[in-house]
Amino acid sequence: KRQWPRVTRLLSQEHQTLPSLPRWDPLHQHTDLLSPLSADNDEVLHTRALAYLLDPVRPHGFDIDLLRRIIRRLRGMPNVRERQLNGILRLLGRTKREREIVVIPEYRHLVKRAKKQTYPRTDIWIEIHAGRSSRLIVIENKIEARESDLQLTSYEALAKEWRKKHPSGRPLLIFLTPDGKKPRSGTAGKWVALPYAELAGMLRRTWLAHKSAPGAEWLRLYLASI
């Protein structure tokens, strides 16, 4: 209840900007992708939608635009190192022939232990390879559910093991939530909290830059769902 005055104020500020936007802007739209399916808050669908948009080999026509916008937007945010972002951007700047980007939604890992095997599942696992250099981005998407006590810690361990096998910089770990709250688990200082409002802004800019792309209408409908 203590949060309602702040939420109301933020919503009021957002609505004041709407009259200055064109009527065709996604922020004005009442028709969206997920609400007809009663799936507005479905974490799996949002995760898969975001993974689709981040994957440059999918036929949406946005290439690496959204991924690059997210990396640039993280500059100056808590738990982010400038060198870390610059390393990722350098690899993204390579030509398509020089680099490989792998985006895997709902990636189930096999972890072998002394007495049992576990199968932790990361929401979005992104590997960027170019020559002898590699980078890793892990996105954990939480809309209504909270992370379990050791969930993020286990993902940190997966990222650490990946780094042992690839010459790379520090893995970029992103915690995506509606309000940008900090995770309650995981190692302090390792996860970057990103709110959906920031993501929506980057999606909108991507849409504005690619309105004639094959996936533009799909992106417009998804953006209206956020």
Regions from the PLM with identified roles:
Residues 1-226:
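Charged, terminal alpha-helix-loop-beta segments
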